[in-house]
Amino acid sequence: MRHDWTRDEVEALISLPFPELMYRAQTLHRRYFDPTKVQISTLLSIKTGGCPEDCAYCPQSALHEKSVKAERLMAVESVIKEARAAKKAGAGRFCMGAAWRTPKDHDLDTVCEMIEGVKSLGLETCVTLGMLDAQQTERLKKAGLDYYNHNLDTSEEFYGSIISTRTYQQRLDTLSNVRDAGINVCCGGIVGMGEDLSDRAGLLMTLANLPKHPESVPINLLVRVEGTPLGEAEAVDPITFVRIIATARIMMPESHVRLAAGRENMTDEAHALCFLAGANSIFCGEKLLTTPNPAEHRDRQLLSALGMSPMVQSEAEMGTMRPAVTEDAVCEMAVS
């Protein structure tokens, strides 16, 4: 795997003629994954609103003109009930998100109980709780956490235009703490916040140049929420979004590339192109934290129409190169 990408290389990949880009992405995808399988996760907001951060895209910030109502941390029993329903609906991983800058000790105790309870159902677990230090990641690891989500959101250069209450380096430090604790990393970003080609390339470059590629790479299409600073941001055309998915697949061929927020406004045809470009993971359920997501029956119908099906637990690990394919062949495909 490469960890030495340059911005120029990534910009060149994104800008390839569309048929060539899709060919390279699909070819690499098939070398590591079954292209007919999709990893299914469900995301639940366990603590909504009242966040002290000022992320320009997020309605959970207490600093914006319009914010969602702040709620208390959910009870463990209520979370387990939601996890049971998610498993019944076909999810293999249950993700829990809390609108915190960083969790307090007593809240982390409760989250650890949630992790243990969800794990007992036979589901993988993922949480996103804000910034973590080494001690906090060790506690989560001890509770059995499988994945921790902490997105970079955008390039380091554009980051200051979106967030001022947390530095880019603080995000990287949290990722390092998560990795050092032996927890799988879930890390991606958002397309459509006013960034340019260089910023999109910079985000993918940073992700792919981490010491180890994230096991899961969620790519979000901005959901424009009224009352947030990005509520009237210019929409991104579907082909541009598909190009980012394809480039992420080429640069991080072993990772699960997830279609995250923004799917509610995507057509079936756009979904199909994303899957062809190498996306192999989605969030299932009618809401992602506070924003809408396609209804479960719509996802089932779409996957059925495409001849695709959910991954089983054993298939949901990082991709493994098929024996007939050499590492040199993969690198040549990525850069030629």
UniProtKB/Swiss-Prot annotation:
Its EC number is 2.8.1.6. Binds 1 [4Fe-4S] cluster. The cluster is coordinated with 3 cysteines and an exchangeable S-adenosyl-L-methionine. Binds 1 [2Fe-2S] cluster. The cluster is coordinated with 3 cysteines and 1 arginine. Its cofactor is [4Fe-4S] cluster; [2Fe-2S] cluster. Pathway: Cofactor biosynthesis; biotin biosynthesis; biotin from 7,8-diaminononanoate: step 2/2. It catalyses: (4R,5S)-dethiobiotin + (sulfur carrier)-SH + 2 reduced [2Fe-2S]-[ferredoxin] + 2 S-adenosyl-L-methionine = (sulfur carrier)-H + biotin + 2 5'-deoxyadenosine + 2 L-methionine + 2 oxidized [2Fe-2S]-[ferredoxin]. GO terms for biological process: biotin biosynthetic process. This is Biotin synthase. The gene is bioB.
